Amino acid sequence: LVRFDASASLSLGGFSRDVGWALTLGDLMRSLRGLFAERPYNFSWVDEMVAASGRPVNRAQMLYIASLGIKAVISLTEDPIPEELVRGLGLECYHVPMRNHEMPDDESLERAVGLIASLTSSGKKVLVHCAGGQGRTGTVLAAYLILKDGMSADEAIEKVRSLRPGSIEPVQERGLREWAKRLEGRRRSG
């Protein structure tokens, strides 16, 4: 993992960070590539109501998302999508920040999954994204499949990875298994 330490404020694709922010090479590459792409990085459908991607970084990408009938965007990144990218597009934006390369806490994970379930049950198509659309996004999607379809953690992880190769980091994989056990325990006692 290559990191660059910013010595000044940096702005790429509508997102800015202050001095001292560590910029990974992956972040830089996604941002630069995203500036010229009309489709968000790593975009794909998970089912007929839920899509996933890396962070949308320009207005054209938000127009693309809206053109697909997506009505809600759930951002898992530390920063929400800037208002100027979505203004007037009829998109509902939700922000459930999660730290990159870590397993989210139960409250954040269940909030994101609850949003997906609530929005899709009301007929709204949803986009879930993090920076690259793999770690945090894959983790939330697997948790959604565990709750929605009653899959085991391993089945959900396998399903997400079959649809979105490279998804879910090892620490998140272990965390999903532990979370699924806690969820099952709450269901039994509850």
What is the predicted function of each stretch?
Residues 130:
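Short cysteine clusters
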Residues 133:
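Conserved G/P- and acidic residue-centered "switch" motifs that form tight phosphate/ATP-binding loops
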Residues 1-127, 142-190:
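Cys-dependent protein tyrosine phosphatase-like superfamily
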Residues 137:
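Ser/Thr-glycine-rich phosphate-binding loops at phosphate-binding pockets of nucleotides
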